[in-house]
């Protein structure tokens, strides 16, 4: 292992080895141990006591973070011509249908979220092999296939995010930026945890939340006590 830099030593000095932090404490410490010169992402990793190979234990959902994500979310609205004005007024960055289907076929996926009206899904379905692996395929369960495209766009712009468990039983998501106040980070983290608890499958027995870690881009992870979601 190479010699630690001054910043690395400072960061490690602020972390108590073996300690499990409350959400409130972790939200303060994460700002103290982040030394990047850019506005780093604040992330959460939650290991669940489920078997993601079983369909009735597949965790997926949406959550509207009270303080948003602190970054611009690029939204593509795939709609018919009569709906384009509503989508644009709601804040969609890209609006259309056939031209964007062709662009995506040719490899363009420079967006964060794609929202589609149900009436166009017959044409959008052919993009599944391209959009699916990137987590961009519109889906009714995540609210990205919607009759009210205008509302769906506004919700995404205001901080609504889609999450799902990976093959290892872990849910990973961004909950904000390091420029947020500790209170904003804590609020977003608790809202995400509360949503995870709501979508617990009825068939799951035993420990549901196995571990929770809070980190930022290039920072060490802080272990968080999941029970502190109801308090400090």
From Swiss-Prot:
UniProt keyword annotation of Repressor present: yes
UniProt cross-references to InterPro entries, sorted A to Z: Ribosom_uL1_bac-type (IPR005878), Ribosomal_uL1 (IPR002143), Ribosomal_uL1-like (IPR023674), Ribosomal_uL1/biogenesis (IPR028364), Ribosomal_uL1_3-a/b-sand (IPR016095), Ribosomal_uL1_CS (IPR023673)
CDD domains (alphabetical): Ribosomal_L1
Domain of life: Bacteria
Biological process terms in GO annotation: regulation of translation; translation
CC annotations in GO: large ribosomal subunit
Molecular function GO terms recorded: rRNA binding; structural constituent of ribosome; tRNA binding
Keyword S-adenosyl-L-methionine belongs to the record: no
Keyword field: Repressor, Ribonucleoprotein, Ribosomal protein, RNA-binding, rRNA-binding, Translation regulation, tRNA-binding
NCBIfam families in alphabetical order: rplA_bact
Entry function: Binds directly to 23S rRNA. The L1 stalk is quite mobile in the ribosome, and is involved in E site tRNA release.
Assembly description: Part of the 50S ribosomal subunit.
Family: Belongs to the universal ribosomal protein uL1 family.
Protein name in the entry: Large ribosomal subunit protein uL1
